Amino acid sequence: MRVTEVFDKRKMHKRLIMMLLIAAVMVLGITGCGKKKDSGSNGKIDIVCTIFPEYDWVKEIIKGEEDNFNLTMLMANGADLHNFQPTADDILTISKCDIFIYVGGESDKWVHDALKEAVNKDMIVINLMDVLGDRAKEEELVEGMQGEDEHEHHHDDEDDDDHDHEDADEDEHEHHDDEEEEPEYDEHIWLSVKNAEILAEYIEGKISSLDKDEKRVETYKKNLENYKAKLDGLDKQYEEAVKAAGKNTIVFGDRFPFRYLVDDYNIKYYAAFIGCSAETEASFETITFLAGKVDELSLQTVLTIETSDKQIANTVISNTKDKNQKILTLDSMQAVTAKEADGGKNYYDIMATNLEVLKEALK
């Protein structure tokens, strides 16, 4: 099973939807030229973020100067990044903003088409994965992990061999070439406190470049300095906790979006699916493998993400020898709504809570 196949079924559908949305926006007859904002005189700086972590980082940077901004979180209802499709209104909002911030992974392929209709030709576009550069990680299938539609793809391959082996080999060769040219990257870059520091600093630089008021710019820079100090302190707490832990491996009865987090602190993991997977049912082999790892490593917990129904985790536990492990939840921040964010939910607190969960999992 190749990781690149995870997205194959979604691409054509998403592309068709985007074409229809772009056509709808064009029918609305958007006209006019974009201009850089002179914040505080000609208008506010419009910033559009796709997901919650970006939104929260911007809030931290502009703290005390919020009245000079229009800040929008596109996935305001807690929609998952992997399933999100922008509406015509979303595309209109993006087209007129001053700064647009998005992750830049496979799930954001719609952005390219949306930006073609930008009214503001001076828009600053921030692709966070591009900002990270070599820190962005390719998706990986670790031992025991179930590939997307594993059994279905296996049967399809058998049919190809039976009916047209030569064509199948040719398709496989072409697909392999595509894989080498365009590897799939793990999109969950925000689940690293170290990455958050890098990305927040870059975002602050772009915000400051748009504001002509020196005092406000000083505020942004001071806010960033304070925020980075908090994140750096949390990073050190993670390092100390992992060093003091009795174990160094976690088992996830779920999809696994925490690659960046565990890699930061050299934590090993086993999981049912990769982070971008749409699978909800684990195979017998996957369940058996994960349960075996829980027994082998004498683990007292099985972990899930915040939106899990815990069915896989419960099944893993029921297949262990002791059958008494606890289920813990790590929050991947993929279901936070704008209302929750505006009500006080924030990136730092969530990552601090994740640290406490991790401490218990590594006992």
Predicted regions: what they are:
Residues H13-A23:
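Sec-dependent N-terminal signal peptides
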Residues R2, F7, M18-M19, G29-K363:
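Extracytoplasmic metal-acquisition and chelation regions
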Residues V6, M12-H13:
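Extreme N-termini of proteins with methionine-enriched Sec-type signal peptides or N-terminal signal-anchor
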